[in-house]
Structure formats: C-alpha cells, structure tokens
Amino acid sequence: MALKAVCVLKGDGQVQGTIHFEQKENGPVMVSGSISGLAEGDHGFHVHQFGDNTQGCTSAGPHFNPLSKKHGGPKDQERHVGDLGNVTAGKDGVAIVSIEDPVISLSGDHSIIGRTMVVHEKPDDLGKGGNEESTKTGNAGSRLACGVIGIAQ
C-alpha cells in the first residue's frame, strides 16, 4: 500500500503551490506538483526540521538533518535528508515539480510528515559554493513560501 502526503505552500508574496508525496513500500518518495509566482530560474527546495510556521517560514528551523551531515545535492552521499536540490521556474513563473528521492521517507526515522517544505529565493548551490553557508543552506537565500507536510488519503 502506498503512503501519501500533501503540502500547501504559501508565503508573504505571490508564491504558492501544492506538492504531493507518494511512497510505495520501502521505495523512493515521488514528489510532484507545481509552484507559481516565482522568478524565472532555479530555487532551492528543501524539507526543514520543524512543522512550525507560527512566525512564517523562519520558524521551520534548519534543513531536516537527522544524520548531522553537511548540505549537498539530492544525488550526493553527503547531504541533509531534506536536501531536494532545486525546482526550476519558467518565464511564466511556474515550477513543475517532479522528483524521485530515495532518502526522504513518509514513515520511520527519515519521515518528513509534520515537517515543513520550503521553496527559496535563490538557486541551491548543492554545497559546492566554497563557503560555510554553502555547507549549511546551499546559499539558497530567503524563504519565499512554505507549508507543513501532512498525511493524505
């Protein structure tokens, strides 16, 4: 049986979206959906530690990182569990999300249920920016929109 989750992204500005998650038993998580209101180009896309949006996206804390690793790209061995890389918005400001990730999960120790999905202002440099901030956040900049990931039917 597949596990499913959903996240509605909202921010202070125009950025909004809906992201769906689906995981078949012990398989990778399929992440799909769309985000609108973005500037054209790449935007960092991460699961953050807390499902707390009481002070907007800032109260979601750092990237979800239960293994205490450095920030990296989604295909890197050295990465936070929540590091999903970038989503790319076209000229229309819409990013179509289609990601398959074997590290995040909808159950167990790496479960993202109840945590916050965040889309960032700038591209994620995937930990290769050559400075300390790169190894923590990928220099992805401010948090444009976020939402808590919840269980879906």
Curated annotation (Swiss-Prot):
GO biological process: removal of superoxide radicals
GO cellular component terms, A-Z: cytoplasm; nucleus
Co-factor remark: Binds 1 copper ion per subunit.
Protein localization: Cytoplasm; Nucleus
Positions of modified residues (N-acetylalanine): 2
Main location: cytoplasm
SUPFAM superfamilies tied to this protein: Cu,Zn superoxide dismutase-like (SSF49329)
Binding site for Zn(2+): 63, 71, 80, 83
Tissue expression pattern: Highly expressed in liver. Also expressed in testis and to a lesser extent in kidney, lung and spleen.
Cofactor: Cu cation; Zn(2+)
Binding of Cu cation, residues: 46, 48, 63, 120
GO molecular function, one term: superoxide dismutase activity
Modification N6-succinyllysine, positions: 4, 10, 91, 122, 136
Lipid-attached positions, S-palmitoyl cysteine: 7
Subunit structure: Homodimer; non-disulfide-linked. Heterodimer with SOD1. The heterodimer CCS:SOD1 interacts with SLC31A1; this heterotrimer is Cu(1+)-mediated and its maintenance is regulated through SOD1 activation.
Biological function: Destroys radicals which are normally produced within the cells and which are toxic to biological systems.
Record's protein name: Superoxide dismutase [Cu-Zn]
Gene: SOD1
